[in-house]
């Protein structure tokens, strides 16, 4: 089960007691809240995985992570996942022999490196799009119309830019959603849900979506703003061409803009059509029903209703999820 802020902790507590989950995934702050209240039995927690460990440190979660680890006495395995190679692992993590104060752990520390040697994957088609104007909104719109209904992540550098881009695209009747850290948790989840299921083909985001967002089948990444550094560029591109899939990455430039050193100068130019196609309609539409498991509602009920009352057939119905409420 998942635990995070932005929603009542009591609902998570009830789920823990009722389900007795084998795996709990949570943010440091919310995990500490449950640990302090003893909402689950720590005697049976033997493995801990900290994802995005480098970013957690960068964002100042040192004390919260140390508190989580300090309340798990039965740990036998600790896994630290990071997109960058740390020179030193903090002592609180409890790995690394002398650093952890545990001599027995030094012989059991294993480092695995899954980073590709090449900066840009061979499965990623990297191209640049030239905008005749410094304000690249119209060029972005034309590019997205050309890409059709394929799932596309548009990256910008600021929250305000997310809102501006989304407002412009929607004024042109282009289906899209916003995603950034200033949004309410429910709004972010709703945007991700629609993007995942194909009812919203374009998600405009800050670099918040560049790490930790695992959505299979993203076809394109668009850099509306040039990334602040090479690391951000790599993580943005990593949202597409995942595993064995192929994908495309487009860099929007105006005539006076220059590529940074970490991006090859000789990447091909993607030419836009003179006649811009109309915005493609999404393949799916998300239908929200204000009932859930608490109301004894299940997938069979929903599908039956859509068949009988909506006149739909099997091919018309996509993913059906029933939440607790």
Task: Say what each PLM segment does.
Residues 11-15, 163-167, 175-206:
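Conserved helicase ATPase core of P-loop NTP-dependent helicases/translocases
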Residues 19-35, 192-211:
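Conserved two-lobed SF2 helicase motor
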Residues 40-119, 263-264:
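Post-DEXD/H (motif II) to motif III coupling segment of the RecA-like Helicase ATP-binding lobe
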Residues 122-168, 311:
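Conserved interdomain hinge at the start of the Helicase C-terminal
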């Amino acid at each position: 089960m998942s635990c995070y802020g932005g929603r009542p902790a009591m609902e998570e507590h009830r789920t823990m007691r009722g389900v007795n989950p084998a795996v709990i995934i949570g943010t440091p702050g919310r995990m500490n809240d449950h640990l302090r209240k003893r909402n689950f039995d720590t005697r049976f927690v033997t493995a801990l995985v900290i994802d995005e460990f480098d970013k957690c440190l960068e964002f100042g979660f040192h004390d919260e992570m140390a508190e989580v680890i300090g309340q798990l006495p039965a740990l036998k395995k600790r896994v630290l996942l990071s997109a960058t190679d740390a020179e030193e692992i903090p002592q609180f993590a409890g790995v690394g022999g002398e650093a952890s104060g545990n001599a027995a752990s030094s012989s059991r520390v294993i480092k695995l490196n899954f980073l590709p040697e090449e900066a840009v994957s061979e499965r990623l088609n990297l191209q640049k799009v030239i905008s005749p104007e410094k304000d690249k909104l119209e060029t972005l719109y034309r590019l997205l119309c050309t890409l059709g209904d394929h799932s596309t992540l548009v990256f910008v550098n600021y929250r305000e830019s997310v809102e501006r881009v989304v407002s412009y695209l929607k004024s042109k009747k282009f289906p899209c959603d916003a995603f950034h850290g200033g949004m309410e948790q429910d709004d972010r989840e709703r945007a991700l849900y629609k993007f995942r299921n194909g009812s919203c083909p374009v998600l405009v985001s800050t670099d918040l979506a560049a790490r930790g967002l695992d959505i299979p089948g993203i076809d394109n990444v668009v850099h509306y703003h040039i990334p602040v550094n090479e690391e951000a560029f790599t993580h943005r591109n990593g949202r597409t061409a995942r595993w064995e899939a192929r994908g495309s990455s487009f860099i929007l430039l105006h005539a006076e803009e220059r590529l940074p050193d970490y991006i090859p100068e000789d990447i091909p130019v993607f030419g836009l059509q003179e006649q811009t196609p109309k915005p493609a309609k999404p393949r799916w539409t998300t239908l929200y029903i204000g009932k859930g498991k608490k109301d004894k509602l299940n997938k069979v009920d929903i599908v039956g209703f859509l068949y009988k009352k909506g006149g739909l057939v099997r091919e018309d119905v996509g993913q059906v999820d029933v939440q607790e409420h």
